């Protein structure tokens, strides 16, 4: 039935994240984290003109590492993420049907795995230019898929995504003015059912221009 909070309500297992940050020296911040989500997409199914109660569950784990260094007038930050089914956080991801019980219609699921890495650098105080570069790669699924139509999530027909952001801000007491240009290229294709990876891709590029004016109280 599409996006719904019922999947995690039916699961009765809360979404969990455990992380730790470290400050090994002045200006440095490093950290690690692990995430778990467990969903029950359905509790019953209509199959061969009958209604069956089913016990379906999709559980996925994600892991991340990040670091940041803040100098006197510059900042560098980076993060890498091995994500599974984190589409509810606006990342590419989701899951697909990996098996169907021929007797009851009960389905098994497999999450898509995506690797995402980004770096960001900004320099200056009053005038502060910055650059952001991000890359996401679809690593497929752990099990084969039943059908390319039985996948659920966001951007599951994208093999890789490359994003660059060039930005500059002008900072005053209580005021901030900014400008950003952000091209993003996504490689769309068809899903290989055996691996969950995307093949026969073609690139589409989107260009975004953003202006900002902010007043701080």
Regions of interest found by a model, annotated:
Residues 12-14, 22, 34, 38, ...:
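A subset of solvent-exposed loop/turn segments in beta-rich extracellular surface proteins, enriched
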Residues 167-189:
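C-terminal closing repeat unit and adjoining cap/tail of repeat-based domains
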Residues 7-8, 55, 201:
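Alpha-helix capping and helix-loop boundary segments enriched in small/acidic/polar residues
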Residues 26-158:
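Detector for outer-membrane/organellar transmembrane beta-barrel domains
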Residues 14-18, 61-65, 115-119, 162-166, ...:
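Hydrophobic, lipid-facing positions within transmembrane beta-strands of outer-membrane proteins
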Residues 172, 203-217:
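Outer-membrane beta-barrel "beta-signal"
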Residues 142-145, 178-179, 187-201:
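A glycine-biased, small/acidic residue-tolerant capping/turn segment at secondary-structure junctions
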Residues 1-22, 90-107:
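Surface-exposed coil loops of outer-membrane beta-barrel proteins
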């Amino acid at each position: 039935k599409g996006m719904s909070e019922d999947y995690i309500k039916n699961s009765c297992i809360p979404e969990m994240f455990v992380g730790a940050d470290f400050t090994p020296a002045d200006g440095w911040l490093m950290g690690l984290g692990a995430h778990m989500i467990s969903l029950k997409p359905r509790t019953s199914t209509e199959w061969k003109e009958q209604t069956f109660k089913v016990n379906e569950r999709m559980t996925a784990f994600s892991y991340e590492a990040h670091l940041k260094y803040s100098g006197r007038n510059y900042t560098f930050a980076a993060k890498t993420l091995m994500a599974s089914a984190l589409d509810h956080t606006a990342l590419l991801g989701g899951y697909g049907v990996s098996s169907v019980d021929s007797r009851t219609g009960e389905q098994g699921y497999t999450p898509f795995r995506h690797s995402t890495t980004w770096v960001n650098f900004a320099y200056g105080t009053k005038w502060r230019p910055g650059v952001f570069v991000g890359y996401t790669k679809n690593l497929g699924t752990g099990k084969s898929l039943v059908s390319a139509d039985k996948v659920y999530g966001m951007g599951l027909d994208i093999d890789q995504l490359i994003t660059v952001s060039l930005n500059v801000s002008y900072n005053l007491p209580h005021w901030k003015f900014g400008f950003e240009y952000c091209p993003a290229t996504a490689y769309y294709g068809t899903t290989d059912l055996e691996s969950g990876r995307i093949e026969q891709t073609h690139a589409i590029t989107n260009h975004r221009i953003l202006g900002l004016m902010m007043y701080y109280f």
